[in-house]
């Protein structure tokens, strides 16, 4: 896992933006100059992940007031992310969340941050990245342990 005080690995990947648009060139470096909470989660359409993402989404305004951008990453495709957003919360979806979800089908991003579970998906990990792109704080949880 990358450590605090080190530069956050940059990446360019497909993503679903808050308005639902799919882009193929979402890049972490575009957020230099503001804080970023980059968080990894195992998979879309699972039991614990929607609750974590919806909890983050409820606090987006608080993050924005502090000039902090939330960004989620999993090994799902951008199309799966889009379908998850379109699925009603009552049916295991997440609805129109207000932060980007990055697709990491190749698991290069997950690997560059050192948060890949031996069975393939990302562990539950969060990174606080400062305005200069340096990691200031990290948390890492095994798959069965949710975040609060």
PLM feature segments, named:
Residues 1-148:
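Chalcogenol-based redox active-site neighborhoods
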């Amino acid at each position: 896992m990358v450590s605090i005080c080190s530069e956050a690995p940059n990446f360019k990947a497909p993503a679903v933006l808050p308005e639902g648009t799919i882009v193929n060139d979402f890049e972490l470096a575009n957020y230099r100059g503001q804080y970023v909470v980059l968080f990894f989660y195992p998979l879309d359409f699972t039991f614990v992940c929607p609750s974590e993402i919806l909890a983050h989404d409820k606090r987006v305004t608080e993050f924005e007031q502090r000039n902090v951008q939330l960004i989620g990453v999993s090994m799902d495709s951008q199309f799966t992310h889009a379908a998850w957003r379109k699925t009603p919360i009552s049916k295991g979806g997440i609805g129109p969340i207000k932060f980007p979800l990055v697709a990491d089908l190749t698991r290069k991003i997950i690997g560059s941050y050192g948060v890949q579970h031996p069975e393939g998906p990302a562990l539950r990990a969060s990174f606080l990245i400062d305005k200069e792109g340096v990691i200031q704080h990290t948390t890492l949880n095994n798959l069965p342990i949710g975040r609060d």
